[in-house]
Swiss-Prot record:
Catalyzes the 2-thiolation of uridine at the wobble position (U34) of tRNA, leading to the formation of s(2)U34. Coiled coil: none annotated. Its main location: cytoplasm. One of its GO terms (biological process) is tRNA wobble position uridine thiolation. SUPFAM superfamilies: Adenine nucleotide alpha hydrolases-like (SSF52402). Its EC number is 2.8.1.13. It comes from the Bacteria. It is found in: Cytoplasm. This is tRNA-specific 2-thiouridylase MnmA. ATP binds at residues 6-13, 32, 125. The active site is at 101 (nucleophile), 193 (cysteine persulfide intermediate). The lineage of its organism: Bacteria, Bacillati, Actinomycetota, Actinomycetes, Mycobacteriales. It catalyses: S-sulfanyl-L-cysteinyl-[protein] + uridine(34) in tRNA + AH2 + ATP = 2-thiouridine(34) in tRNA + L-cysteinyl-[protein] + A + AMP + diphosphate + H(+).
Amino acid sequence: MRVLVAMSGGVDSSVAAARMVDAGHDVVGVHLALSSAPGTLRTGSRGCCSKEDAGDARRVADVLGIPFYVWDFADRFKEDVIDDFVESYARGETPNPCVRCNERIKFSALSARALALGFDALATGHYARLTDGRLRRAVDHDKDQSYVLAVLTAEQLRHAVFPIGDTPKPAIREEAARRGLAVADKADSHDICFIPSGDTRAFLGARIGVRRGSVVDATGAVLAEHDGVHGFTIGQRKGLGIPGPGPDGRPRYVTGIDAETGTVHVGDVTDLEVTSLLGEAPVFTSGVAPDAPVECAVQVRAHGGVVDAVAELRDGALEVSLRTPLRGVAPGQTLVLYRSDPDGDEVLGSATISAAR
């Protein structure tokens, strides 16, 4: 089988490539150049797009004895990930750029190019498993990345390979060291790669500009003015620009955002609790949409917990009733449905949250 391996320059994708070689496949490594402007992408850790990371990936490919290329996806990445991220925040949403990157870059644009060039599959260093075409959590639940892959269609998954999903992260590092890969001790990073400063508010402000509005409490009283709703997210407690806690002495949190009026609503932590979610553009990883309510577990953050729920498809949208309330759920987040079985937690599907009540 001809396999294209997406090599970020980190330890995970490096071991994934090595395992594909060991399995006897015809392997080619590729690194995606996601920016042409120096200093615009985070480097030195678990990067996926810097010159330093490309160099690390090339050195691993040399050790493995496989061809290696760098493909320029900068324009596509800007349009489908960065611009989407900015526009989503301007609408008062809270997107996950890693979800969007997997959906539109790695397993759409990159996978399509791979198939067009005659490759049979795209392998990555994601912590997830595929068994009988079913997407499942990784063995290492602490590193599991099935959440950010839950937007993939059955057709996209049919051409995907996740070689390290059955191995805990410490063992991956040990394996890399045994293989003599210099990235064995390379640090992980959980930051947004295209915000090198780590200051999301400043990044968004520079691109959206000042759009003044008000911060109001449950009575409608104006507590403060702000420079744009992009500086806030549901559940936020710090950096609200308000004088202090509420009249009862309890902290106040962002409970709602109205991008059209520029109004940021704040209230008590109990106001953050929701018991139902509405998801747009649902994707079912099996390729088959359920025709009846489904008992499942729901996760709304990449490294968040799950709660039991019932999900039902109605008029093209996913309606989810939670058995236990969740706090701080924001429009723009991805909701992922899981189902437990003897082979591990299976991903049923996902949707983008449009409302939480």
